[in-house]
């Protein structure tokens, strides 16, 4: 029998269930993975109110709001760098970057029917050296609530020595080729059975959770501690999503390495809790169109938060089409099925191989809204390759095939990228893929 511990305030309920710990918020905030935009990948520290409002307006004008994208998130470098207000101890928005303050900007974003996010860190300074929130959790949570903030990205920089963990957790990032990943150079591992919930890292993040729960506004809580301190074990009871790796970059080797690492964490994904492989790089750098497609499809299939990180006023139609794929977004936002797609076959490698250059290539996931099963086939290699989805290998299709017997071995198939009905496909579907491209299918009713 599942037991629950509830901490109730006017703003939120913290529900802890054995075996399925989750931070449950009012209004279903955080039940589904977040959709939005963030300033960092596009602009870094070079931000101001005009750039944030441009992004907000483009989310509306480009039709992204209608597809569910709702958060407009201000990342690092938004405050006065020299320190807090001496009398109130509050962080102060940079008046040159944000002449109407964060609250004035938030009002404008809310007027568009969107939500607004902000950034801080569980340390003394942010990653760019601005004031952060360790020791000021209650003041900052109250300030964010008063400003109308709806989302907090909480980083892991500026941690003082007295808040450093006693042990070092193994995050094989980028890792080396080995089964499940190892950290052979870790000189300070925790003893067997160590509970990372007791770590100082977990405590730093709990303090902000408790502060956010206590304010009279529901603020989605996005942990960004890079997979440290076994956050997969306690992240769901602390926040709505939690970063699993270091930062992403707009390069295929980095995207592949993160996809590989995150692919081993799919059992942690369900309603109210999402391992986060970092923000999207679609539209950035020198990624090929195929790599942009594969990046987005994998992130959507894993039900990761989909936070756009490119300048929307200059986005190409090809990149916009990827971010706007209705089939992948429907799978991602399924109101009935919380579980993600899972790898069912590694393809290039033997199953369960940890290989940053070649993540799992064959994925499938159930859906209540697509009329079938989502299936992905990735070409992780550097040359054109053929990939084949065999129906009897796909977990969601095995029972159907068993009931049909030998009389019917086909399924109606739809191409996710084109929306084209591919007809009744018997036994398997085979396709030639460019380097680092992905085929995405909805495998529907038997035929």
Curated annotation (Swiss-Prot):
Pfam families: Melibiase_2, Melibiase_C. One of its GO terms (biological process) is carbohydrate metabolic process. GO terms for cellular component: extracellular region. PROSITE patterns: ALPHA_GALACTOSIDASE. GO terms for molecular function: alpha-galactosidase activity. Disulfide bonds join 45-77, 127-157. Substrate binds at residues 225-229. InterPro entries: Aldolase_TIM, Glyco_hydro_27, Glyco_hydro_27/36_CS, Glyco_hydro_b, Glycoside_hydrolase_SF, Melibiase_C. Residues 1-22 form the signal peptide. Keywords: Disulfide bond, Glycoprotein, Glycosidase, Hydrolase, Secreted, Signal. Its EC number is 3.2.1.22. It catalyses: Hydrolysis of terminal, non-reducing alpha-D-galactose residues in alpha-D-galactosides, including galactose oligosaccharides, galactomannans and galactolipids. It is found in: Secreted. Glycans are attached at residues 162, 180, 236, 286. The keyword Signal applies. Its main location: secreted. The active site is at residues 155, 247. The keyword Membrane does not apply. PANTHER family: ALPHA-GALACTOSIDASE B-RELATED, ALPHA-GALACTOSIDASE/ALPHA-N-ACETYLGALACTOSAMINIDASE. Belongs to the glycosyl hydrolase 27 family. Hydrolyzes a variety of simple alpha-D-galactoside as well as more complex molecules such as oligosaccharides and polysaccharides. This is Probable alpha-galactosidase B. The lineage of its organism: Eukaryota, Fungi, Dikarya, Ascomycota, Pezizomycotina.
